[in-house]
Amino acid sequence: TDSVRFHVGGFVRQGEGPRETGYTSNKGGQIKANLTKDFDNGYVRLYYKHLDDKSVGYLPMPMYSNGDSIAGFDAQSDTPHSALFTKTVRLNGENQISSGDIRDGMNPKVDSVGFEAVFDLDNDWRIENRFRKSSISGNFNSLIPAEVGSASSIAQSIGGVGATLSNANTGAAFNDNLAMRIHTFDVTMNDFDSLVNDFKLTKSFDDDTSITFGYYASTQNIAMSWLWNSYLMELKGDNAALLNVTAADGTEFSENGLYAYGTPYWGNCCQRDYDTEYDTRAPYVAFSTKLGDVSIDASARYDSGEARGNYAGAVTSTVDMNRDGEISIPEQNVAGIDIANASPVNYDWNYSSYSIGANYQIDPSLATFARISKGGRANADRLLFGKVRADGSVAKEDAVDEVNQFEFGVKKRFDSLSVFATAFFAETEEQNFEATSQTFFDREYEAKGIEIESTYFIDAWDFRGNLTWTDAEIAKDALNPDVVGNTPRRQADLIYSLMARYNYEKGAAGVSFIGTTDAYAQDNNDLQFDGYTQVNGFVSYDLSENLNIALNVNNLFDTVGITEAEEGSVPENNIIRARTINGRTTSVTLKYAFN
């Protein structure tokens, strides 16, 4: 009807993905819908979303420190994922024997409903409310090489002097020089439900002035179980096989490639169970006005909340995992959850935020602006297993990370050209935990830089570009003071993107460039990645008024671009575990638009 409208959209997908996993690793879909009812003075909109999607999670994988691929494993197109390794058996968060499916990859399951209502009231008041309730669960299951090295040394680290490896599928002796120690990053997301409401009331005045009063409230559950296992695998990209370990006297130290239930190579650090709830309440106020050619806005917010729940770490026991009536060597020490000795989570937090900005319009084509702001975030599950005291409390300085930022910029428009330039300075706190290195972070960063954005239109051509220069350093580090003054890992001095597009009567064609200069792999500032530029091309054509076909080629020149690595220095064998951009990928899209 004239006052009721709706929108329904979504996607369904199925495929292997950009790297060769050996199975259908991207599978699932989403549907989103909304229904809007218009009134004379506002509207009410209802939302619904259902998501159940699986996509492979690519973690750092083996390559040489200069980005070259290792024989048999292409760093740009291969992955340790394999059709010969799809299941893992472990104890779940309740210490019951259960199985995980590596093919689940990143598998969020979300059902979300919500509404928003916006109405204009008498005397220039406006009332708004937005509400959302989400039921969230799922899985994360991927493979991370914990070690890439000599096959014989890895075998002997498990089975002793003279231990050998064999193919877990065929039983044939394994004679390659290199092998991988694989850990399954296996997480069951039991309950990530959330409830969010944002209410605001705005008063507008005749002189371009308005003031808003609001109240935000949310509840977020974080209940999940980390269920790691350890395997050996050949270093190969196309359906790599699992490897078994046999001692010199014939004793079997593994079964179907699994040599440990847990991660003894990491000290069995990471078998974990979380069951926590985080509540947040935040009143806020915002003000804006215009004084001649100067626009001013200011806002303030006070966040407070509480964290309640418990968490438990690892404990080992003897368990007949395959129920065959015998206890194998891996079954002698099975990592489970220490439920009997769970630790409490019981702390509160609060912090204030503000932002003040001004824009001065010098003339219709030139303006300057400035902003000073302070914000923060309450730390949640990353504090557990490190910063939470025995009674569940947390130090005030650990509960919240704050950010202070200053910006100043200029905006200039010409007939066909626009240029925006912003200088910034930021101070950022970080409390964090990295599972793959079992490292806690308690530090502060300082960064200053300049960001430039520009657009240029001439005839049928469209050019766009942006670049950011950043000078960042680790200003403080409570746990590792040796890195103070160093550049934060993965932070390049310059990042940029450029795009050129030609628009013709029935479509468009163009090319884009995304690039970065050199960056350090880790905070010790030793191993450094080369900068790179990724070139992408695209072309589209309207087959009819409603039907369009498009061709996209990403990484047109098959460039190697390393984005992160576990190692901070080049190891003796020159092999690192790193993540690189995908090699060349091509897609063809057919789109039909309904009238």
Feature-to-residue mapping (PLM):
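Repeated loop/turn-to-beta-strand initiation elements of outer-membrane beta-barrel proteins
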Residues: S3-F6, N41-L46, W125-I127, D208-I211, ...
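Outer-membrane beta-barrel "beta-signal"
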Residues: G409, N574-N595
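Predominantly transmembrane beta-strands of Gram-negative outer membrane beta-barrel pores used
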Residues: T1-Y23, Q30-D38, R45-Y47, E116-F119, ...
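Gram-negative outer-membrane beta-barrel transporters
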Residues: D293, S416-E434, F440-N524, S544-N546, ...
